[in-house]
Each structure stands twice: as C-alpha cells, then as structure tokens.
C-alpha cells in the first residue's frame, strides 16, 4: 500500500485491514513522509492483529525515536540519494541518472552474478 504521506494513517490502515480480510498474505505500508500525527497506538493495534507486517517510510522528515523502536517500522535511508542530487546540482549536471536507477541496478546484478560483494 503506497501513499505520499502518513498523517493519521487511517486510510492506509483501513486498506491493509481490507486486503488482509480478502486473503492477502502480507501487507506493507510504504510512504515518503511519515508524520504519524495521531501517534502509533492504531499502528500497534493493527500490527498485533496481523493487518500490517511492515511500515516503511523515508528519513526525509523527522521520525520520532519511538518509531524506530517499533518491530514493524523500517526507515528507508535516503541520505545517499539526496547527496547525489545535491552533488549533481553543485556540478551543474543532469540528475537523470540519479532519478533512473537502471544503470545502478544493472551494475549490482553484474556484481551479484560475478560473486563480488557490494
């Protein structure tokens, strides 16, 4: 379940419950900005009830320390991505390669196939 942000989380949690009730094996909630304006109680309840397996959000906004302690919470580190964008701007070059990860994916696949750690 993907959305641009989690404010209270009501809509995403409702979708998670519905898809689990319809037979989904797992439910992952993914968002760019996790604000969690109503706290984590409802997320805790849904996790404990088995409606959500993970909540994944970027570290592009402040994340309360309590979020990092949740067993279902994963912070997607965007530091390197932001650094690449800033570097591209500072050198007046296109950010196309930053936005299109195809070359990086192919490079990782080649390393994987060759048994090279990455």
Features from the language model and the residues they span:
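PRPP-associated nucleotide enzymes
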Residues: 1-118
